């Protein structure tokens, strides 16, 4: 059928095509049928939804979908039934526990990106991967397909280094130190980062406090070739676009298939042209990987996948049993990270982890002899070279290179929790800290978060401050206080835990 485009002033986040009920009846189209909207060489696929918001002879598409294509208001298009994609058969094959061939995986990924697969079909694929898994042949094929269906970065400066943490630890602003340290040593490190999904601040959320993070691929190439590094948001790029779509299904189902997680991380490294990749796997209670045994198994998978992609991968299994540094939340973390770069000093957990990871990268890149990388990283940090490089990165990304950490605004609605008893800090609950910071407004409210005054093993007296909640709004502060009282994120115990009498 022929119809005219009507742009709906809404952002659906889905490829839904609104069709008038009379038109649908005449064209024998039903809700959720896949259709192709075509005009010349332009085409987009979407699922049918019947609606009286569009008149007869019109087809409605939301503005966010139109932004990705070049259709215009009133343009005449053909609405063509698309049938069931062949990739659905391949998804059913994986649902039955069978191994997928490379061409079948490529078809599934291509149809996800082209929006030929509906949400229910994508969810079925993700669920099948959770239940039946993927072997390394399938993971490698999935990784390459996810990368090659999006944009690829080609930077002349070599070698290209990269670092990625699988996350789970609150306050992980480590890479904001790692990147300028590595770049100051003459290596190239184009770092793309995510925004927070379930955490209180992703690296991109923190960097956005003092510099722009949204750039095109061409702009990133110019920045990196000028200063040797960047700290940007990967979501603004068309890197491994299938990943962004499957993540929505994972989030809705609260699952994270290992094979898909490996492909998600490594496809973006592959697309960025990374040659040497360091994977940080935090391990401990309250993070994604709780045991060293799990971490070692995952490390072997990353290394093997890297070999198949032509990348040299090393893995650092790091301590993740409590927050890194003393701050959680975008602005608070920005202050702490920039202060550490500016002075060469900071919380032990932050400095040790940052220089440890940077040191491994320096050795991988051949600028530090084996066993000397961490020492070299510390020298670069303490000499001020890392701060000078960070200022170059900030300026290249549109920020003020003369920024002062203490001038970064933080939430002025505060509440401080104090120790109810004297003793030693025996545990800090990562998940509770994250939940409280999010309740306070992080990461959407940049100034919201938590400032920690104690860490595990430290002695406290009754009445000593433990942590302060920062918020930008009183209502959010109240929510965070209620949650903190309920979860009690910091545990304090005496040396004598319990007395049992002789009964």
Swiss-Prot record:
Keywords: Allosteric enzyme, Glycosyltransferase, Transferase
EC numbers, comma separated: 2.4.2.57
Cellular component per GO, a single term: cytosol
Inducing factors: Constitutively expressed (at protein level). Does not respond to the addition of nucleosides.
Active site: 256 (proton donor)
Keyword Aminoacyl-tRNA synthetase: no
Superkingdom to which the source organism belongs: Archaea
Single Gene Ontology MF annotation: 1,4-alpha-oligoglucan phosphorylase activity
Binding site for AMP: 168, 194-199, 203, 264, 288
BP GO annotations: AMP catabolic process; pyrimidine deoxyribonucleoside metabolic process; pyrimidine nucleobase metabolic process
Reaction(s) this enzyme catalyzes, per UniProt: AMP + phosphate = alpha-D-ribose 1,5-bisphosphate + adenine; CMP + phosphate = cytosine + alpha-D-ribose 1,5-bisphosphate; UMP + phosphate = alpha-D-ribose 1,5-bisphosphate + uracil
Regulation: AMP phosphorolysis is allosterically regulated by the substrate AMP.
Function per UniProt: Catalyzes the conversion of AMP and phosphate to adenine and ribose 1,5-bisphosphate (R15P). Exhibits phosphorylase activity toward CMP, dCMP and UMP in addition to AMP. Functions in an archaeal AMP degradation pathway, together with R15P isomerase and RubisCO.
Protein family (similarity comment): Belongs to the thymidine/pyrimidine-nucleoside phosphorylase family. Type 2 subfamily.
Quaternary assembly: Forms an exceptionally large macromolecular structure (>40-mers) in solution.
UniProt comment concerning the protein's domains: The N-terminal domain (residues 1-84), characteristic of archaeal AMPpases, is essential for enzymatic activity, participating in multimerization as well as domain closure of the active site upon substrate binding. Harbors two dimer interfaces within a single molecule: one by the central domain and the other by the C-terminal domain; these two interactions can continuously occur in a repetitive manner, leading to multimerization.
Protein name: AMP phosphorylase
Organism expressing this protein natively: Thermococcus kodakarensis (strain ATCC BAA-918 / JCM 12380 / KOD1)
Gene responsible for this protein: deoA
